[in-house]
Swiss-Prot record:
Organism: Emericella nidulans (strain FGSC A4 / ATCC 38163 / CBS 112.46 / NRRL 194 / M139) (Aspergillus nidulans)
Gene: rmt2
GO CC annotations on file: cytoplasm; nucleus
Acidic residues: compositionally biased ranges: 155-168
Function according to Swiss-Prot or TrEMBL: S-adenosyl-L-methionine-dependent protein-arginine N-methyltransferase that methylates the delta-nitrogen atom of arginine residues to form N5-methylarginine (type IV) in target proteins. Monomethylates ribosomal protein L12.
Gene Ontology biological process terms, A to Z: methylation
Similarity comment: Belongs to the class I-like SAM-binding methyltransferase superfamily. RMT2 methyltransferase family.
UniProt subcellular location: Cytoplasm; Nucleus
Keyword Nucleotide-binding in annotation: no
Protein's UniProt name: Protein arginine N-methyltransferase 2
Keywords associated with the record: Cytoplasm, Methyltransferase, Nucleus, S-adenosyl-L-methionine, Transferase
Summary of subunit composition and partner proteins: Monomer.
Molecular function terms from GO: protein arginine N5-methyltransferase activity
Length: 426
């Protein structure tokens, strides 16, 4: 039987940590974190009423009281929060956030309002704090990437198995702690956790989106969307403007040779055709999509070559044949970031001309702005390491109210799409 006194002590310890974080009392917070002998990382305790972690609390405490944010004439101010007597508070918060991240605070833990600490910082206009959380997320993903134990960067990142994720986090903490420099004469581990542990899977839990499940899934082709058997949106018509601009960026003149990996609804391939390529190769892995392509006569279009299968199996053959392209587009479904990174680190160099360009559908983390910002930096660094420069063009995303009716979950919720255009480094 649980000891009620112990339970009260644990709750009081949690509240002490949260209070010290919200008051930006780094000295007390450091003592509490180091002295805590409860199970789990005290930097990630949760307030049961708000779901706040210490990181949430430290950032949320920077929000001005309403009466402090209203001018004497009663007009609400809309300027930068940091210019209204908040400088000292924000500076204290910076030091608190720094400490918490060093102690292993989870950068994208969710509160009961479905906000991460970075979401709160962005909502309050706290740019410096937001950037700190973004950088922490980048460090976490890059480290887990190098450990070959990171989760896939996809729409499912918030819902990975909790036990597996915790093992990844523990391994990352141990690895990172061994290389952390001392600061202020105290050795502290830097952030490596990526998400809060998800609840255990139940018998009726939603199935994971994996490549093998998708490729064995029945598909539903509708006028404005393509869905798998679990009602996941594989591709939707609202992406058309993005695809049109991508095709024009990749194929500025007629007569170029292009490869598209992932046909889906055929949106980008339709726009590619409008650019009059001399050769248009398409790799498509799903048998139902291939059948739909043939039904629509894609195999009869001039210059079009359909490769049935996964790019992992098709591309080595094209390399062996010496087939080269001036442009490549990548837009697969249910593949992991590890697959994508293998594509541009191992495969692109074998089929892309020296002056060629390539792009991809940039939807990683698009369910919230901070995830999108983190994953953009991650892929940018990995592209650089693979020998590619990348330029980004921001495109307005149309209002998507009503678009998600009948779809398992929205995979896009931010206002701007960042279109990548990659080429070999000079």
């Amino acid at each position: 039987m649980a000891n009620p006194v112990t339970e009260i002590d644990v709750d009081l310890n949690t509240q002490e940590v949260l209070l010290a974080a919200s008051q930006h009392d780094t000295a007390k917070l450091r003592r509490l974190l180091r002295a805590n002998d409860a199970a789990g990382n005290p930097a990630n305790v949760k307030d049961p009423e708000t779901g706040y972690s210490p990181l949430h609390a430290a950032i949320a405490a920077c929000e001005p009281d309403e009466e402090e944010d209203v001018k004497s004439n009663g007009v609400q101010t809309n300027g930068d929060r940091q210019t209204h007597g908040q400088e000292s508070t924000v500076e204290a918060a910076v030091q608190t956030v720094k400490l918490l991240l060093q102690e292993g605070a989870i950068w994208n833990d969710l509160d009961l309002n479905n906000e991460t600490p970075g979401c709160i910082a962005r909502r309050l206009g706290l740019t410096e704090l937001y950037d700190m959380v973004v950088d922490a997320g980048v460090r976490a993903e890059l480290l887990l990437n190098r450990l070959d134990g990171y989760e896939q960067l996809s729409d499912e990142e918030m819902e990975e198995d909790g036990e597996q994720e915790q093992e990844q986090q523990d391994a990352a903490v141990a690895a990172d702690a061994s290389i952390t420099n001392t600061a202020e004469d105290e050795s502290v581990p830097q952030l490596v956790d990526t998400t809060a542990a998800a609840p255990p899977q139940t018998a009726d839990a939603e199935p994971s989106v994996t490549s093998s499940r998708y490729l064995n899934s029945d598909l539903t082709f509708q006028q404005d969307r393509l869905l798998d058997q679990d009602q996941n949106g594989v591709m939707m018509a609202w992406e058309s403007d993005i695809m049109a601009k991508s095709a024009k960026q990749l194929l500025p003149t007629p007569g170029l040779r292009v490869l598209n990996v992932g046909h889906g609804m055929g949106i980008v391939d339709g726009f590619i055709q409008e650019q009059s390529p001399s050769a248009h190769h398409i790799i498509e892995a799903h048998p139902a999509v291939v059948a739909e392509m043939k039904r629509k006569g894609w195999h009869e279009k001039p210059g079009v070559v359909i490769h049935e299968g996964k790019w992992q199996d098709i591309l080595p053959g094209l390399v062996a044949e010496g087939v080269m392209f001036d442009a490549i587009y990548y837009d697969t479904f249910a593949e992991s970031y590890a697959d994508f990174r293998e594509f541009f680190t191992e495969q692109v160099i074998g089929v892309l001309e020296q002056e060629g360009k390539w792009s991809f559908f940039n939807g990683m983390g698009a369910d919230r702005q901070i995830s999108y910002d983190v994953y953009q930096k991650v892929v940018e660094m990995d592209l650089f390491e693979a020998g590619f420069d990348v330029e980004w063009e921001e495109i307005d995303v149309p209002k998507l109210e009503g678009e998600w009716n009948g779809v398992r979950r929205p995979y896009w919720s931010i206002d701007k799409y960042r279109l990548p255009l990659c080429k070999y480094m000079d």
